[in-house]
Amino acid sequence: MKIPLITEIQRFSLQDGPGIRTTIFLKGCPLRCPWCHNPETQDARQEFYFYPDRCVGCGRCVAVCPAETSRLVRNSDGRTIVQIDRTNCQRCMRCVAACLTEARAIVGQHMSVDEILREALSDSAFYRNSGGGVTISGGDPLYFPDFTRQLASELHARGVHVAIETSCFPKQGKVVESMIGIVDLFIVDLKTLDAHKHLDVIGWPLAPILANLETLFAAGAKVRIHIPVIPGFNDSHADIDAYAEYLGKHAAAISGIDLLNFHCYGEGKYTFLGRAGSYQYSGVDETPAEKIVPLAQALKARGLAVTIGGIVGIANGKNELTGDIALEVHH
């Protein structure tokens, strides 16, 4: 069984499914969405954050690194700083252990199913009283199907509501099929319905995602769709029409759709991971309401329940921005 590293266990979450939840973030995802705000969950291997503002240039990390990935240099104001080249990093994490100022931090911890259960079940009373539960997220939990199946089964057997957040990417349909019955809610990211863009930009074919999604629909599984509305990627009139047509055909099988506005909140993580140059959305503004509301209206017209996360509010049943369409909203 392929066992994932855990990047975070977030307790008392209100945004990853119904009620009060604990969200388990697994490290590893085969997709490479250029706007990803959790880049630390992409690579399945252990990594480290480097916080330059905490570094005092003592050189302890330089001394212990077997691959000589770090070296001391002087910056423009004459201060000694550490320069890191991660190309040959062996991921031994000796530099993290040697750092006295916590300028480095390990990303990804080893945890067994039993260890995760102990932590997640400690909040069972909150789940019961709020209609909440546990959400397995990532990364993508289907990147580790056996582990996810075991964790979901253990939670399900204890009466805990289980959700997973996934792109439904597996090319082997049996992976998704094996989750039906032990997962109470599938939260599926549907980033675009343009097959060429999906492959060229995200690096993964669209066909298996739609096939898996339709498997869930046919099985009567509870499915909620997340659509991240990304400027210049999936916010055109053609995109709106494609989403409305496809999802409208399956309206009866979809419990709701959440439109998520783009933001740059994760940009700093790329820098801390040594990947600052790979982030393509630096300086891009959040998705404007005029790009999200038409999509919400088109989906609502097809009989779908729609929420807009973090952009449009409701006051007395009226949309605060448009005044003409009442949408449920998550902040």
Curated annotation (Swiss-Prot):
GO biological process: toluene catabolic process
Reported function: Activation of benzylsuccinate synthase under anaerobic conditions by generation of an organic free radical, using S-adenosylmethionine and reduced flavodoxin as cosubstrates to produce 5'-deoxy-adenosine.
Protein's UniProt name: Benzylsuccinate synthase activating enzyme
Family membership: Belongs to the organic radical-activating enzymes family.
Keywords, alphabetical: 4Fe-4S, Aromatic hydrocarbons catabolism, Iron, Iron-sulfur, Metal-binding, Oxidoreductase, Repeat, S-adenosyl-L-methionine
Regions annotated as coiled coil: none
Positions of [4Fe-4S] cluster 2 binding: C55, C58, C61, C99
Cofactor list: [4Fe-4S] cluster
UniProt-annotated binding residues for [4Fe-4S] cluster 3: C65, C89, C92, C95
Cofactor note: Binds 3 [4Fe-4S] clusters. One cluster is coordinated with 3 cysteines and an exchangeable S-adenosyl-L-methionine.
Gene3D superfamilies, alphabetized: 3.30.70.20, Aldolase class I
Domain 4Fe-4S ferredoxin-type: 46-75, 80-109
Highest taxon listed in the record's lineage: Bacteria
Catalyzed reaction equations: glycyl-[protein] + reduced [flavodoxin] + S-adenosyl-L-methionine = glycin-2-yl radical-[protein] + semiquinone [flavodoxin] + 5'-deoxyadenosine + L-methionine + H(+)
Induction remarks: Induced by toluene, probably via the TdiR/TdiS two-component regulatory system.
Pathway the protein takes part in: Xenobiotic degradation; toluene degradation [regulation]
Residues reported to bind S-adenosyl-L-methionine: W35, C36, H37, G139, D189, L190, K191, H263
Organism: Thauera aromatica
EC numbers on record: 1.97.1.-
Domain Radical SAM core: 15-315
Pfam family, one: Fer4_7
Database matches in PANTHER family: PYRUVATE FORMATE-LYASE 2-ACTIVATING ENZYME, PYRUVATE FORMATE-LYASE-ACTIVATING ENZYME
GO molecular function, one term: metal ion binding
